[in-house]
Amino acid sequence: MARVSTKENKNIYHKTRESLNLTREAASELMEVISPERIEKIENERSLPHPDEVLLMAEKYKQPSLCNYYCANQCPIGQQYVPEIKIKDLSQIVLEMLASLNSMNKQRERLIEITVDGKITGDELEDFIYIQEELERISIAVETLQLWSERMLATGVIDAEQYNAHKNK
């Protein structure tokens, strides 16, 4: 029987594998192309995972959030442009999205006033920044909903065949 790690500061890849009760050997067999030694290097942060390895782990562990984590925290481009998405319940995602959409509805006229001339003047800057931040919150809510959907599909909570049939109509 494999021993359980007692390491305190486990990274997300280590925690995810252990949450599935997989040894490194079993995870390697599941993924077919990543050796137990490579998994150990990734988990002990002696080596960063490659994007293709993260994609494979996300698929085989049924945790699409690993891709977002990698992009937001380990990819130099993603660190600058990709926000880390936190896993939330569907109701919380929808309520946050609706709150942001309602706020933007109230700001729609102001956005038109600010941008109609193609310039942002000093007296418009504060409102423009607020609107930008609200749009970013909407974007994050959309990404969170997408990640939630991917996880539900990966784990079988949402029937992938039905989902794809409806999506491809």
Regions found by a protein language model. Give the residues of each.
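Short alpha-helical DNA-recognition segment
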Residues: S19-K41
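Short, charged recognition helix plus adjacent turn
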Residues: Y70-A99, M152-K169
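Acidic, glycine-anchored loop motifs typical of Ca2+
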Residues: K86-D89, K106, I112-F128
